[in-house]
Amino acid sequence: MDRDPSEEDSMADLSFEAESPVLPPDELLEGLPSYDWLLQGRERQVFFPPLEALGRSQEPACWSSVLEHSRVPVVTEEVAREALLSFVNSHCCYSSAAAGNLIIQELRQQTLCRYRLETFSESRVSEWTFQPVTNHSVDGPQRGTSPRLWDMKVQVPPMFQEDTRKLQVPHSSLVKECHKCHGRGRYKCSGCHGAGMVRCSSCSGTKRKAKQPRRCHLCSGSGRRRCSTCSGRGNKTCATCKGERKLEHFVQLVIMWKNSLFEFMSPHHLHCPKELLAKARGENLFRDENATVYPIVDFPLQDISLASQRGIEEHSTMLASRARILQQMFFYSGGPFHHS
């Protein structure tokens, strides 16, 4: 295939293609607050201190009134038998005869209590990225100083709904030539090395198949075929800059809203698999939600009180250095468990 020699000079050889830069251009960092940047391994990433959560002015709930109005129901023999029959009927191959005629001699009741703490937090990090330059205007340092990432106003999703968003940091863009194609927009095809043609795979370039007098029908006797990688053009559009020759480097803000969960179940002596107990539904006896919640300090069950303190401390320690706590919510639930 004939091509203009000037086109040959304007294409980069794929074998000498540049690797992606490890660090962003120095010019990109000059307009950013230096104390916001931390060097982690071979990548630069922003790690900002969280904003302090708003304090609470309310007093802790009175647990005596909560317990007074929260009565755990008592399961009778009739209720227990109905529950057993309901379980049997939910399985196609189970017989209800044994469940119906079963003699229940004794019902021993235990109350299983749960404490569940959910903490909704927001963390912000930054990453350097780039994209092909298009017709849109470039928002560079000449338009102002880039704000600190925690100063950027972002709409918070509904509480306890996890989400991730990525935003371009204002005034952080910088245009440079593409590091992959060296600003040419394309490079030589690796399949044909820029020739546009490759050796015929059917006749191996001999123009005829072995022990056959006729010429190869795939290459029409030429011994070469059009390169399928580049469709015979001899070059490919640079996948990094999409042929635009230049890249816009900028800092990208990554905001992550996540839920952290802490659960505790009161000690029990039930001979029941943990996975079944986890699925059992109790009654929510109390629920509290605020920017920060109090640990339970006056609850009759000391295990629940200690668990609430431990859960709040764990979440505070875990999130203090890397996130901002937006909202906390805890549930106290209880339910009767009977075995005969």
Swiss-Prot record:
Xref: InterPro entries: HSP_DnaJ_Cys-rich_dom, HSP_DnaJ_Cys-rich_dom_sf, SSUH2_homolog
One Gene Ontology term of the molecular function aspect: heat shock protein binding
Keyword Transcription (UniProt): no
Cellular compartment(s): Cytoplasm; Nucleus
Acidic residues bias: start-end ranges: 1-11
Any GO CC annotation of this UniProt entry: cytoplasm
Chief place where the protein resides: cytoplasm
SUPFAM superfamilies attached to this UniProt entry: DnaJ/Hsp40 cysteine-rich domain (SSF57938)
Annotated tissue distribution: Widely expressed, with highest levels in the liver, intestine, tongue and underjaw.
GO biological process: odontogenesis
Secretion signal span: none
Disulfide links within the chain: none
Alphabetical keyword list: Cytoplasm, Nucleus
Ranges for region Disordered: 1-20
Job description of the protein: Plays a role in odontogenesis.
Identification of the protein by name: Protein SSUH2 homolog
Provenance organism: Mus musculus (Mouse)
